[in-house]
From Swiss-Prot:
InterPro entries: SfsA (IPR005224), SfsA_C (IPR040452), SfsA_N (IPR041465). This is Sugar fermentation stimulation protein homolog. Belongs to the SfsA family. HAMAP family: SfsA. One of its GO terms (molecular function) is DNA binding. Signal peptide: none annotated.
Amino acid sequence: MRFPTPLIPATLIKRYKRFLADCRLEDGREITAHCANPGSMMGLAEPGMRVWLEPNDDPKKKLKYGWRLVEHTNGHFTGVDTSVPNRALKAALEAHEIAEFAAYSEVQAEVKYGQNSRIDFLLTDAKLPRCYVEVKSVTLSRQPGLAEFPDSVTARGTKHLRELAAMAEAGHRAVMLYLVQRTDCDRFALAADIDPAYAAEFETAHAKGVERLVIGTTITPEGVKIGDILPS
């Protein structure tokens, strides 16, 4: 998935109110960018970090920049826009690029199911059981090479696990897919110390048949590409 508009570099001044970030452009101007990430963004919102923004000229949007990436001092990137994983995965699923799902002929996004929820992707094929895929963006890393989820308590994520488990018990295929939006991680673990309830609910869901799939990404200022399956 390529970014529709070329990204521009900037320096983060501060993130606040979760969805706002003040940044300094290379020409010295200070602007406010939209931060499409409701999480804590632990380790990703320190003043002085190099970030990449996507400009827009949409008259309906008050903020003319969207925060897309963090560039670390080691040259690696982290994607901070939580809408990117679904867009990148939709393209990969439709192109049958993910082996675990390649046999499914139809991909539907945001389908109603469960308790007033929407599943990220419903995969169907006449010869296969329905496959419900819930996607989580993974950006936390507290140890070199190890990506973790979640970065804050997520009651919503716990609810999604219960709903996936119900689909598995009903005879459908149910997959919890963690997309690692970091290029410096090759392993994954649940951050049970941050949200023990989520970790416990995952074990319950897994015992009921919910699969866990962790996929890496290749990230540059040009775009995000779905990568390899990572150990977890």
